[in-house]
Amino acid sequence: DDHVVEPPHLFQEYMQPNLRDLGPQLIETEKGHQVWEFEGATYRQVGMNAVAGRKPETVSLEPFRFDQMRPGCYDIDARIKDMDLGGIWAMLNFPSQITGFCGTVFAKASNHEVGIDAVRAWNDWLFTEWYSKYPERVIPGGITYLGDSDEAVREIRRNAERGFVSVTLPEMPRNVGFPNLWER
């Protein structure tokens, strides 16, 4: 179980060109922190989410900059080196702050096309830059679009066809608008 930190280029590179300006943007705050901005809300790269190799006293809940993080948090080649140092063979990844828990941030997007494309971009980035480079070491855990069950199924199937073996889902699907399984 491992978390990835989405790199600065993810959404600009992997979202459809006509939607990129509406997707998540990495911005710098007045205090010099780097945070994600999406639909008027900000999502911090919280220090507690990227603490590998840091002394506990240097960690806070303040947002980190990418140049303050260990590169293995967001770069797969550096991550593999870190895993080798720790004697770890494989990792099952989970997303970071910008997606929200299980992709809920994108499911709540006011423009569903943008939300769906952000989910696809995240999965395409994970597939292209992490899993494809180290398929024997990365157990790809995708996210899906939780705003529509049919779209969720399409994204899960799309990822399964290319080797994803897991998907991150909320433990209580009814909390994101899916039917309550116990009320059948």
What is the role of each PLM region?
Residues D2-R184:
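Helix-coil boundary/capping segments in enzymes
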